[in-house]
């Protein structure tokens, strides 16, 4: 139950009764704790339509509200705010209801939807680096959130395995080892099962090939021709390319496993290749595509968005072509309600073109919503894209090792590597996801690793503290679900209990905002606020030495609720919580 929605519905009945539109009854969390828990600001915009002063409208609404079981206090403030304070029993009862629900008050979306999530997107032959973090972590959080809310999710890594870089690699290896059978056009036998290069060698070959092609137009033409021949099915090139893909996927899977990020599908641009001819024929049959200076293009019919080149002059396909073919494939195979792409904001124009063409040509059905979660860049302290001290791109594996070092340095007596791993992951993931995805942000690992402030380790520390209370009382194998039946939250005895209860019942609000806006930072902010409220409660509300047994049990229930809410919230952003720290 989203408490903002519940209160909005309660006030909407009064608005309707008085002849006002229900849309003005929206209730939001108060921006000032000193005046109330929630507020309704609808009287101000309503005044223009009702031809009344907003203060008079607010007073009229409050006068007609009859819900003493929900509200302890309703106050009107200029120019027309309605400040709402919840009744202590309603607050306690709602906390209990959430504690005893499987999803801490969150209800499944109805009807359930099928959502395809496209994220990760590493390129073959390139090791994963810091720049891949945002897509991987943001996409993983979104798939967790969508599944939690009841959607059927299909996640796809969508490998970059079919572009000009493949031709660059082929030509570079051909230059180094022309004797390999992959380059003999007359060879008809079976190709070797072992790759002629390792993934480490690929990572060295690609920069060299890229540099050569950028400095020599003839080399670039060779790479483009090799790419075209690969896409046309030249046997030796296909066999060599298959080695590139296989060894790259093995390496990439290890990187994603280290982040606890997983995919349902491991498809790439190449998997859409077999749909391109069928799709082009469809475009031609329906007069969507036309020739322009030797290339084949499709108009977007959107102001400021240029046409999409589908086939180049040389007959090769573009990045946009494979993206359209991927949409074609997904639409036919999965029939989704929504497809979400978690990709760098520098690709925004590209996705505007692809989405516009896909919708105009009905590559996707009318019910299917296309969304680009366009995230900002990961920058260093200097405000530029994050680099190593030597100025190079930091590989993901090196970043994780560095995070583990920070965790170990702050806990030198900790010998359990699994706990160090959990702290390192919390450091990286929370440090990234606490930021609104649309913004660039500074990646400061030293700051993220602190055990206080808005950090992952602080969250872990708080939950471990709450768990230790329960463990001292119930032993190691306690079960919150069964214990909650006998431990009930009661009306708050002080401001610390009240603020903790109020924070706990706002969990569904954070989840709904994260879900609707594809913004996991709402869950991060919620978890941080809950951690602060619990730590103040912990300091000011003793449990073990209490003589009042009913109060003791009520505070234990608040500890249970905190552990449950924090555990779910942490899982939604891909963070696992240790038993101790």
Swiss-Prot record:
Catalytic activity of the protein: tRNA(Arg) + L-arginine + ATP = L-arginyl-tRNA(Arg) + AMP + diphosphate
Class of enzymatic activity (EC top level): ligase
S-S bonds: none
GO biological processes: arginyl-tRNA aminoacylation
CDD domains in the record: ArgRS_core
SUPFAM superfamilies: Anticodon-binding domain of a subclass of class I aminoacyl-tRNA synthetases, Arginyl-tRNA synthetase (ArgRS), N-terminal 'additional' domain, Nucleotidylyl transferase
NCBIfam families: argS
Protein name (record): Arginine--tRNA ligase
Naturally occurring in which organism (per UniProt): Francisella tularensis subsp. tularensis (strain WY96-3418)
